[in-house]
């Protein structure tokens, strides 16, 4: 790819693509947004990096705005989402300690409960709480003290919860797992069990947060809040920046030097992130996300009635999964050939993560292109056929693709 503008990218030959993947939820304002470009140019000429030994004009105001959006009290900036996951795990272990626990000895509260089908990142802590085996098993043994709970199963959560649990870690909407929202019943039980047992509820909103679902944060559709919220992806409009948002009760247990970062919270990234948040507010993008998301849901519903290999449409704002009964990879390739960028996750779910700024006309353009893709793509193996082939002699290569 050569460059982008708005909801489009262009390759080196000049071919134009409608970008409905957005750097996997990073380019929430599309490409080359004029206000973002202006801030990058201005601040790059002043100070790109200073280190966290010194104050600069943007980190404090950004932290205040994130606290305002989320209802949290404190913010710790990081380089990325996966670093935010690892940092949150450290804070949860710290919160589980008591003054009587000798340093270097495991606290009674040290276990994590994470969800089946989850993905939290690729650093060592993050893969330890990632259920998807292809990301975790090659690096075993991983961090001990992690158990996986059946997705949206409050009874299984309750059965696995005890006094040794320091935190429940979940994606409010599973992204890599195929766009699966946590149910209200599961969230409420996780919140109540964590509160009853003195554990933490940690919401990974790295992909679904900061407006993606039509709310500032996906958990805001529930009546209760988590103890920590983890964000990254769109925060600095394409520059690397993540954050842990947390309550005062959790943050107050951290003393200077317990955790740190080299690049997290630098002046350039924070200045851009502040501008991103301002654009979301001033351009009323939450309204656009909800409106365009509903148009996409309705249009995809019509296509589902035409193509019987579409099993289900799952949508939260502009975070959309199209589950197929056949493998999705060929559809991704056909879409790219026709000038449309999407991707496939978990083999059978096409994932759409368009920018917050898409227009009604661009939604119509997508639906027209996507209908052609569905009609023209040669139909690959169905889910049941793929499962059978995985156990036939000579099919090891297919299973290895994961």
Q: How would you name each of these model-derived features?
A:
Residues 1-402:
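Conserved N-terminal phosphate-binding loop of PLP-dependent enzymes in the Aspartate aminotransferase
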